[in-house]
Amino acid sequence: AADFVPGDILTEDIVPNPVGPYGESKIKAEEYILSHPAADKQVYILRPCMIHGPGNKGNLNLLYGVVKKGVPWPLGAFENHRCFTSIDNLCFVIKGLLVKEVESGIYNMCDDEALSTNGLITVICKALGKKARIWYLPKGLMNGMAKVGDGLHLPLNSERLTKLTEDYVVSNAKIKKALGIDKMPIRAEEGLTQTIKSFTNTK
């Protein structure tokens, strides 16, 4: 729910700073649940990063479509990193919470490795059997084009450029410690490859 993340890595201890009604409503829901505890029940609030799996219909699917058409990624100079959540890892965690004695609380949920957008595009291309087309255009040029987009209301503007290039790295250390594990069962690249291959099987 925290669209703006102060610092390098988001942990459960960082006070959320949601931007917009979507994030704000999620925090309000968390506050309500935590303010009405049940004496005989455990309460878990999971904060997953972008969840993906076979049949995914979100932004990952859109990026896949762009890459499949051979459109170059022009923001290669921005080496950002973002965390994702494989549906297999999410199901593993939920099962663990159901069968183990885990303390109530808020838990971040994500795969162990953060990937750059360049890395994500490389994973998509590898699944497609294609060579990644990544352009490393100067950051100054892209920032300038985004400013022009602000004034002319073009698809690429400063806000969208920030969204496309910002970091969103999350710690899953708390949930792994609670479940008594050292790592998630599915690596980030493995899970993303499974998701991407599900797209190739349905197109």
Where are these regions (language model features)?
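Residue-level signal for the nucleotide or nucleotide-sugar donor/cofactor binding architecture
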Residues: 20, 82-88, 115, 170, ...
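Mid/C-terminal beta-alpha module of Rossmann-like enzyme folds, strongest
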Residues: 100-156, 187-188, 192-196, 200-203
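A short C-terminal helix-loop "cap" of Rossmann-like NAD(P)-dependent dehydrogenase/epimerase domains
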Residues: 15, 64-75, 130, 155, ...
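Short aromatic-enriched loop/helix-cap "lid" or pocket-rim segments at secondary-structure transitions
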Residues: 5-8, 56-60, 119-122, 146-149
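A secondary-structure boundary/capping signal
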Residues: 47-48, 111, 171
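Catalytic helix-loop patch of NAD(P)-dependent Rossmann-fold dehydrogenases
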Residues: 6-52, 56, 72-75
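Substrate-positioning beta->alpha
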Residues: 28, 56-62, 76-98, 104-105, ...
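Conserved C-terminal active-site "lid" loop/helix of NAD(P)H-dependent oxidoreductases
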Residues: 87, 122, 145-182
